[in-house]
């Protein structure tokens, strides 16, 4: 079996081409199932974002797996396989785990270190597992990758190094309030910046996120997409909404201010508009304009570079851990066999003991059973640890056969597998 990743991403493709090779959320489950029916594909998972469309797969042979994945994608997007192939990057074997760990931590993103990719990968994994297209290898790889990414986000405080003006504004609000529980945010103006800000704010912990746009239907559409804590408000209620929320982010494109703020207002305001959306009549306000936000972004550049390097330095060990696990897959039946063999002997000895000592009450029987199981587990703990270590050495097959003979498990036939099988 081989790991494989077939990728269409921003490194090779400009936006106008990436748009042609993307799946909608509704299409991904169907595509996962259809791809899984192709020859050579044992496991598969598909992810599609604005920066990449990728298939992660376990295939029985590299050349056939590569062909059928390419053919599937080419047919889906109505290309000939020859024309489609020039857009594709294929990664195989050891390099797949390294690639995934870079992608899921944001190191391979257009904006380095961006945290959204973790959520997108989690969603893709959940869809694939629900559709039944993943198995032992992809399940383990993606669970490990998700755990690793979460650990990196916590360890290096990734979310604090904002990557866009909207993210920087949200970070400033979080710094102001600490906890966002019970807080309400208004997002005014739903162009590219405002829309992305709304998407990011929707899962930050605000109790409500209120959307306002000069075209009310756009606010309603985005609120319907996001649901949860996100609600639309009519634009003619702007003044009332801003006065009653805890914080507001303005991101509209206007020539004249949309709102006048004086010292009577307690709302924290982040103004990303150029020209500014808010006319400020007091220096006492909690007000941040786009220059303040850019200062945050610029101050984070060096911190972000160091963060990215630190995360990159941790990836090789994570990759090594995965491939040690993969190499040990073939030893799983042996370990399971040893446990079952040992428990069977323990069970027979326990039954024999009860026949010889029928006067034992239920409590005494439970104590004896517990201690017998403990003895068995302690006895096999050492051998299991040793055979796991031996299973990744060049002479693994002979060692495993000898191990089985020692413990009376000659009936177990185990094939040695390495990275190339």
UniProtKB/Swiss-Prot annotation:
Binding residue positions for substrate: 49-52, 109, 114-116, 120
Xref: InterPro entries: 4pyrrol_synth_GluRdtase (IPR000343), 4pyrrol_synth_GluRdtase_dimer (IPR015896), 4pyrrol_synth_GluRdtase_N (IPR015895), GluRdtase_CS (IPR018214), GluRdtase_dimer_dom_sf (IPR036453), GluRdtase_N_sf (IPR036343), NAD(P)-bd_dom_sf (IPR036291), Shikm_DH/Glu-tRNA_Rdtase (IPR006151)
Active site: 50
Pfam families xrefs: GlutR_dimer, GlutR_N, Shikimate_DH
Primary enzyme class: oxidoreductase
GO molecular function annotations of the record: glutamyl-tRNA reductase activity; NADP binding
Sites marked Important for activity: 99
Reaction(s) catalysed (UniProt annotation): (S)-4-amino-5-oxopentanoate + tRNA(Glu) + NADP(+) = L-glutamyl-tRNA(Glu) + NADPH + H(+)
GO process terms (BP): protoporphyrinogen IX biosynthetic process
Pathways involved: Porphyrin-containing compound metabolism; protoporphyrin-IX biosynthesis; 5-aminolevulinate from L-glutamyl-tRNA(Glu): step 1/2
Function (record text): Catalyzes the NADPH-dependent reduction of glutamyl-tRNA(Glu) to glutamate 1-semialdehyde (GSA).
Note, other: During catalysis, the active site Cys acts as a nucleophile attacking the alpha-carbonyl group of tRNA-bound glutamate with the formation of a thioester intermediate between enzyme and glutamate, and the concomitant release of tRNA(Glu). The thioester intermediate is finally reduced by direct hydride transfer from NADPH, to form the product GSA.
HAMAP family named in the record: Glu_tRNA_reductase
Family: Belongs to the glutamyl-tRNA reductase family.
Quaternary structure and interacting proteins, as annotated: Homodimer.
Protein name: Glutamyl-tRNA reductase
UniProt source species: Limosilactobacillus reuteri (strain DSM 20016)
Chain's gene name: hemA
């Amino acid at each position: 079996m081989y790991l494989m990743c077939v990728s269409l991403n921003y490194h090779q493709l400009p936006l106008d081409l990436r748009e042609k090779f993307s799946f909608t959320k509704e299409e991904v489950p169907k595509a996962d199932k259809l791809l899984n029916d192709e020859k050579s594909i044992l496991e598969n998972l598909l992810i599609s974002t604005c920066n990449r469309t990728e298939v992660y797969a376990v295939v029985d042979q590299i050349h056939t797996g590569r062909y059928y994945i390419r053919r599937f994608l080419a047919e889906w997007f109505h290309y000939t396989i020859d024309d489609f192939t020039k857009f594709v990057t294929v990664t195989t074997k050891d390099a797949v785990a390294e690639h995934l760990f870079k992608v899921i931590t944001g190191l391979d993103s257009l904006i380095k270190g961006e945290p959204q990719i973790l959520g997108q990968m989690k969603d893709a994994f959940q869809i694939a597992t629900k559709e039944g297209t993943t198995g032992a290898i992809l399940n383990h790889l993606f669970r490990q990758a998700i755990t690793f990414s979460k650990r990196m986000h916590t360890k290096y405080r990734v979310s604090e190094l904002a990557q866009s003006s909207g993210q920087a504004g949200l970070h400033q609000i979080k710094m102001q309030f600490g906890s966002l529980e019970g807080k309400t945010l208004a997002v005014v103006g739903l162009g590219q910046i405002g829309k992305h800000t709304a998407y990011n704010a929707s899962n930050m912990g605000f109790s409500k996120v209120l959307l306002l746009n000069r075209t009310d239907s756009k606010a309603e559409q985005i609120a319907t997409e996001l649901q949860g804590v996100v609600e639309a408000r009519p634009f003619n209620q702007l003044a009332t909404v801003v006065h009653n929320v805890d914080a507001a982010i303005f991101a509209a494109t206007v020539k004249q201010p949309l709102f006048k703020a004086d010292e009577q207002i307690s709302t924290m305001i982040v103004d990303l508009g150029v020209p500014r959306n808010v006319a400020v009549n007091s220096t006492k306000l909690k007000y941040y304009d786009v220059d303040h936000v850019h200062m945050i972004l610029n101050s984070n550049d060096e911190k972000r570079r160091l963060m990215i390097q630190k995360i990159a330095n941790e990836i090789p060990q994570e990759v090594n851990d995965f491939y040690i696990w993969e190499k040990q897959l073939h030893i799983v039946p042996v370990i399971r066999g040893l446990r079952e063999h040992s428990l069977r002997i323990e069970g027979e000895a326990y039954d024999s003991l009860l026949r010889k000592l029928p006067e034992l009450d239920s409590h005494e029987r439970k104590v004896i059973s517990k201690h017998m199981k403990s003895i068995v587990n302690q006895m096999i703990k050492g051998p299991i640890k040793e055979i796991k270590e031996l299973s990744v050495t060049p002479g693994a097959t002979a060692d495993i056969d000898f191990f089985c003979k020692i413990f009376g498990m000659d009936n177990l036939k185990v094939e040695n597998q390495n990275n190339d099988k």
